[in-house]
Structure formats: C-alpha cells, structure tokens
C-alpha cells in the first residue's frame, strides 16, 4: 500500500511504478502460497482527489503486467494505491480490488476481518473490507483524527463484529483528509507501514520507497493524519 498527501498536485507515475514493484516483489508471509504473477498479483487500484471528489480506478490484473497502469495520466494532491494478495483466489476481479469507495470515503486495507463483517462479505460475495467501510461510514460522525480514532477503536474492539482479525492496516481518504492506521495481531514483519513526513509531502507505504532518510516504522495501533511536517497521530492502545 502507498499513500501521499502533498501541498501541490504531483504526477502519480512514480507511485504507480512502486505499485508494480510491490506486485512483483513486495513482502510476503513465508507460509503463504505464492500466486502466479508475483507476490501481490491479484489486482490493483488507486484512489485520488480531483476537483474535491475522490475518484477510483481498479483492475483485477497484476499491476506489473497491466498496460492500464502505464497509460494513466493523473496529477493529484491526495493519493492511495494498493496491490492485492487475495486469501481466496476465486475472488480476484476488479470489483474486489482496493481501494473501495463509499459515501465519500475511500479505504484500502491489508489484513482480513472475520466475525459478522467476514460473514456478511461471504454472504454477499463481496470483500470484508467493503463491509467494514460501509460500517465505518455510519459510525465516523466527526471526520477528524479524534473522531476516526473513536470510531476505529469501537469497531476493532468489537470481537463479534471483526472477530480475531489478522490486521487492520488501513489507508483512509475523505475530502482533503488522509489517514493511515497500522494495527496487526500477528505477522508483524509483514504488516508494516512506514511514514515519511515533510513540509510539502507526507508519504506512508508498506515498505520504504527509497533508501533516503526520514522513514520511520509506525507503531502498532498508531493512527496518523497526513498533515505535513507536523502530522499528528493517536495511539489506539489496548486493542484486543
């Protein structure tokens, strides 16, 4: 996963290149069976802000081999990108690629939810992430960092709702606001999120995008708002 917020619109082509690289060789848990086409070959998607709207483009084709990726010409100041490793290969199609968009919120997720969220996803034959997003849109009343912190804490503490989820690494965009949550229950070396903040651009990615300085590993339970050099964060401590 990759997301950035910048003071001025910028070309997303370099970030699309990183998505293609993550598709081919991004981190993978050793015990997982590798799928044909790379480490994360089961579709890709982006969400970006244009004219105060969040727009999405999604594909069920591996990012590393999809010609659409190289054809996109997008400049934006808010961006979310995701390449997918599907726990169930039968679900690989564009409509199951992240990010999902619902009622003005875009959400990309690494991990799997169980409980009622997972059951509803199976019954509707949709992603558990989409079901989670629909619930989040109802519960997130105040579209701020404190408001999101309350909503996510309540949802992730509800074992009946999300079960013993593997991780809730989330990138969340709404309007001009962009947030990242790193939350894992296992496989900490896989469910990573690194942040680099600056005056003009804040970036969060599953792995550092380059060897330059400034990357830091987000804490487990850390919720970060993209807001320049002094991006605020909250720690959702004590989650089950």
Predicted regions and their residues:
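Extreme N-terminus nucleophile/cap motif
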Residues: 1-62, 180, 185-188, 221-223, ...
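Short helix/loop capping segments that flank catalytic or ligand/cofactor-binding pockets
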Residues: 13, 56, 89-91, 109, ...
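Domain-scale activation on soluble regions of proteins
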Residues: 36-41, 50-60, 75, 113, ...
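Short, basic and Ser/Thr-rich N-terminal targeting/leader segments
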Residues: 40-44, 50, 63-64, 74, ...
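Conserved catalytic micro-motifs used in adenylation/nucleotidyl-transfer and phosphoryl/amide-
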Residues: 46, 96-113, 157-207, 212-217, ...
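Short acidic (Asp/Glu) patches
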Residues: 58-73, 81-103, 116
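A short, polar/proline- and glycine-enriched secondary-structure boundary/capping micro-motif
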Residues: 65-70, 119-121, 189-195, 214-217, ...
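Short histidine
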Residues: 114-177
